[in-house]
Curated annotation (Swiss-Prot):
Protein name: Carboxypeptidase S1 homolog A
Family from the record: Belongs to the peptidase S10 family.
Catalysed reactions listed for this entry: Preferential release of a C-terminal arginine or lysine residue
Lipidation (GPI-anchor amidated serine): S625
SS bonds (residue pairs): C50-C121, C325-C361, C332-C354
Organism expressing this protein natively: Arthroderma otae (strain ATCC MYA-4605 / CBS 113480) (Microsporum canis)
Signal peptide segment: 1-19
Amino acid sequence: MHLATGLAVALPFIGAASAQYFPPPVEGVTVVESKFDKNVKITYKENDICETTEGVRSFTGHVHLPPNNNDFGVNQNYSINTFFWFFEAREDPKNAPLSIWLNGGPGSSSMIGLFQENGPCMVNNDSNSTTNNPYSWNNKVNMLYIDQPNQVGFSYDVPTNVTVNPINDEVTVADFSNGVPEQNNTLLVGTLGSQNPYATANNTQNAARSIWHFAQVWFQEFPEYKPNNDKVSIWTESYGGRYGPAFTSYFQEQNEKIKNHTITEEGEMHILHLDTVGIINGCVDLMEQATSYPDFAYNNTYGIKAYNQSQYDSMINEFYRTGGCRDQLIHCRDVAAESDPHFYSHNETVNKICNDAGDFCGQKLEDAFESANLGFYDIAHPLNDPFPPQFYKGYLSQAHVLADMGMPVNFSQASDAVWKAFHTVGDYGRGDVRGYIDDLAYLLENGIKVALVYGDRDYICNWFGGEKVSLALNYTGTENFHKAGYTDVKVNSQVGGQVRQYGNFSFTRVYEAGHEVPAYQPEVSLEIFHRIMFNKDIATGEIDIAQKPDYSTTGTADTFHIKNDIPPEPEPTCYVLSMGRTCSEEQVKAVKDGTAVVENYIVKSPAGKKQGPPPTSTSPPSPTSSSEGSVKEFSVSVLGVSVLAAITFFL
C-alpha cells in the first residue's frame, strides 16, 4: 500500500492556551547509567498525568543507546533515544504480568494506543485535561508503551529545530540562528528528531534488532520495575501485524542464543520470558491479505459497496494476472531470500524490486477505495473521520504536560523519516527472515500464545485478511484450528463478536469496531485482553487454557453470515492538528486564509457538514486513475496532500 508521507505534529497551534514554541526546560529527571556500558543510560521521571488512580505509579523516559550499538551488519551510526511510558497495574503490580504496546505505521507513535484506545486516560475536548479510563489495559497488567523505531513520537536521534506547515503537515529542518519566526495558522515551530531517514531503522527486522537492545537495558536496569511475575507479552496493531511476529520471534531466537551461549556479551544475556503476541487489526502479510481489500470493499457484513462488479473484477485481475501483484511479490521474496537473507536491506536491487512490488499492489488493489469517500479505518464512517478523537495531540503539546513528562523534544504522531526509510527498501512487500506468518507458527511451536483480534469495520487491515492469515499458519495445531468453529464472545450480557480458538491460537472478529478496536469496544476489548493474558478461553473466560491445552471452540465454519447495521454518522469535528484527516475543503481553506474560528484546536466556524450514508449500491463513483509510481491526489487543490497522507499511515 502507499503509506502516508505527511506528519501530524502536535505542536502548539496559534491562539491555543499556553501556546509555546519549544519544550520547557527538562527538570527533575533521574539518570541511571548502565552498569554494563557507561555510554548507555536511562533517563526517566515519575509523573501523575494520565494515570491518576491513587497509589498507581507511572514513569516517562528514554533509553539512550550510543552509535554502533546494534547488531553486526546494521549500519547504526546515530544515537538512539527510545521513549517509553510505563504504567504499573492498578491491581497487584508486583505480581502482574507485563505487556509492551506498539502502534504501527511504520512510523506511528504508541501514544495513539495509549490515549485513543487502551491507556489509563482519555483526553477531553479541551485538549488540556483527561478523564480516567475504567477499561484501561493497566487494570491488571503492567503496561509499557514504546515509541519506535528511532524518531517516532517522542523518540529521537538528535534534537533538531523544525518548522511545520499544519495545512499539509510538512516538516522542514530549520536554522533559527537569525531568530525564530512567529507562529501563525500556516507555520509552527518546535524541536523533533533530525528528520534524517538514515538515522532510524529502515525495515521491520532491523527495528526488531533495535528494540531488543532497548529491552535488554530496560528490563535489567530500569529501577522502578522489579516484578515477581517476569512474563512479557507484546501487543500491537496495524503495521504491528509485522512488528508483533518479527519482534517476538527475534526475542525468542535471542533467548535461545543466550541459553546455548551463542550470546555471551555482558548486559545482553537477559532472557525475556515471552507469553503472548497479540495483534489488533494487523497487516501481517501482503501476499496473503492483498485480495482482501477489494473483497471487503465490495462485499462486507454491513452491505456497504465501495465498488461495482467491473471495478472489483479489475482489481482481482491485477493480483492474479501475469506480472501482477502476486507475481511481483513472489519475485521480491525470491530475490530477497537469495541476495538479502538476513534482511539488512543493503542490496539496492532487492530494495527496488520489493519497493516496486509493494507500490504496484497498493496502487492496483487499494488506492481506488478513495473514490468511495469512506473511512479507511472505518468503512461505515466518512473519509474525514472524527473518531477516535485526536485531542491527545493538543494535550501532548501543552507546556505543563511536556514538563511533567520531562521531554526534551516536541511530540509527533507519525515520522515521515521512518516511513521513507521503510518504503525505500520495500519493507511492505517483503517478509522478514522467516516470514511473518511462519514467525507466528514458530511462536506457537514454542508455547507462546498468538491472538489475532480484528474489528469488522476496518478497511485498511480488515478482518477478511486477518482470517486468511489465521488459516495460512502451518504448525502442529493447524488441522485442529481449522476444525474449530466460530462461537460467540460473551462479555457480561452482550455478545461482542465471534472467535475461533484452538489452544493457544485464536482469531476473533469484534463487532461494530473499526481499526482501533479498543476505542470502539473498550469493555469487550479489555475482556478479550484479560482472557488471553490470563490463559482463559476467549468465548466465555471460564475455561483455563493452561489446564486444557487442547481446548477448541465449536460452531460454524465461518462468521460472514452474521450481518451488521450501518451506524449513524458521527458529528464532524475539524481538528487543526489533524486537518488532512478530519477537515473539509472549506474548513482547511478558512484555516489557511485566517478566517476560521478555532477553539482548543477545534474549528468552530465554518462548521462541518455530514457526508451522508455510505453507498450500498453497486455504482459508487469510478476510481480516478493515477500514473504509474504516483499516489493519487485529492481533486481539491487547497489540501495539497494525497489521500493516504490524509489517513496518516497504518496506525
